[in-house]
């Protein structure tokens, strides 16, 4: 029987991390699934490193990243290029992950071409359209367009049902990030720790800091840096801060913080190294969604530097808490966890709130269960849903595997 062709679109570091297990499962089922991967290059440098680490070779790279690009720039450069690829590849299904501009654009293109859309990590909500911006609106729009909603938790599934999404299209699978963590854990014995994790550093209480969201830019980031400057004065503490490459983060951090013996301002870490640092940390300060999912697996308290979170499961379980982005509030919460063994014990219970490591297996099983329907749908509507557009100019990069990469410029 003909294989099910799934065209997956990704462009950022989190998308690579969370789709890698699905691609592995597709490979395991390669007798039934033909996987085509499109990389938009939304986070060209950071995501490209991860693609190599996970052994993912995209068939197409749109290379859309530009310095100081706006959201409108990302959308305008991506839509026509991705549309042409969909016309060329004629997939049975398009798959996206999360709530990035890449996911939103791919969902829109799939809808325009009447291709069924599978949404991994569906149903996350803050119910505030501006927080996070623009992710909250992206994921709401994607939910309107999707045909398969792979919710990471029962709460996310309930959010979708409350919005009128057909219940039979909602599947609680767990979050694929837990799948990735399980794989990394199985390999942990063969890895060296990052060089800055010396014996002296490991003997202290390591605080891992990550910050990158748009709503953190400006005054909130200044407050975070002020808090860090106060925290590193504590002799028992080591702060590890992988500084995001976004100029609005990097410029401000470099201006406000100076390296000290116990303050490690480092380049963004490879994912494996980042997880190793997290495992050796005492607690985590972050505005990241993914870190809120990862840290509880290792029993690391998470102080969430945001006003609201679309991952309330950690808040309800008591392993994470929202902290106002004010220096005094941040320092106060850190000191409380440093000084109160009881408070730390309550927040440092190891919990796998977001899955059991089998999400990719469940996602693949659902798609294969609908294989005949998806193939029939394309065959019935194929000619009508494939508008005529100029042919895409390609160059072969791997003849043995028929890998095709899109050239930059106007060709895609």
Which role fits each region the language model picked out?
Residues 1-241, 246-399, 403-408, 412:
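Nucleotide-activated sugar donor-binding and catalytic core shared by glycosyltransferases
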């Amino acid at each position: 029987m003909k294989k099910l062709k799934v065209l997956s679109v990704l462009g950022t570091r989190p998308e690579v991390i969370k789709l890698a297990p699905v691609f592995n499962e597709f490979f395991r089922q390669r007798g039934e699934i033909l996987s085509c991967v499109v990389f938009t290059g939304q986070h060209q440098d950071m995501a490209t490193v991860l693609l190599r680490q996970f052994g993912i070779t995209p068939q197409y790279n749109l290379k859309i990243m530009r310095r100081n690009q706006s959201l409108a720039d990302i959308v305008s450069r991506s839509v026509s290029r991705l549309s042409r690829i969909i016309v060329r590849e004629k997939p049975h299904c398009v798959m996206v992950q999360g709530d990035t501009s890449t996911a939103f654009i791919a969902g829109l293109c799939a809808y325009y071409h009447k291709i069924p859309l599978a949404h991994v990590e569906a149903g996350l909500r803050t119910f505030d359209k501006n927080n996070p911006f623009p992710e909250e609106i992206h994921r709401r729009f994607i939910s309107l367009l999707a045909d398969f909603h792979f919710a990471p938790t029962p709460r996310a599934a309930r959010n979708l049902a409350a919005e009128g999404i057909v219940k039979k299209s909602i599947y609680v699978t767990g979050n694929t990030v837990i799948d990735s963590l399980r794989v990394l854990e199985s390999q942990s014995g063969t890895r060296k720790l990052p060089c800055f994790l010396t014996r002296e550093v490991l003997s202290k209480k390591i605080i891992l800091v990550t910050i990158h969201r748009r709503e953190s830019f400006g005054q909130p980031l200044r407050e975070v840096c002020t808090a860090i400057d106060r925290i590193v004065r504590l002799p028992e503490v080591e702060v590890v801060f992988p500084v995001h490459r976004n100029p609005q983060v990097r410029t401000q951090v470099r201006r406000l913080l100076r390296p000290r013996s116990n303050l490690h301002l480092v380049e963004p870490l490879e994912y494996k190294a980042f997880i190793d640092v997290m495992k050796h940390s005492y607690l985590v300060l972050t505005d990241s969604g993914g870190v809120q999912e990862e840290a509880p697996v290792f029993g690391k308290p998470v102080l969430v530097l945001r006003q609201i979170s679309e991952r309330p499961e950690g808040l309800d379980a008591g392993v994470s808490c929202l902290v106002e982005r004010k220096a005094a509030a941040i320092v106060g919460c850190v000191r409380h966890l440093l000084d109160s063994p009881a408070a730390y014990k309550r927040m440092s219970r190891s919990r796998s709130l977001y899955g059991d490591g089998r999400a990719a297996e469940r996602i693949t099983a659902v798609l294969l269960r609908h294989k005949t329907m998806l193939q029939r749908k394309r065959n019935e509507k194929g000619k009508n849903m494939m508008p005529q557009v100029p042919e895409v100019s390609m160059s072969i990069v791997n003849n043995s595997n028929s890998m095709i990469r899109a050239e930059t410029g106007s060709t895609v």
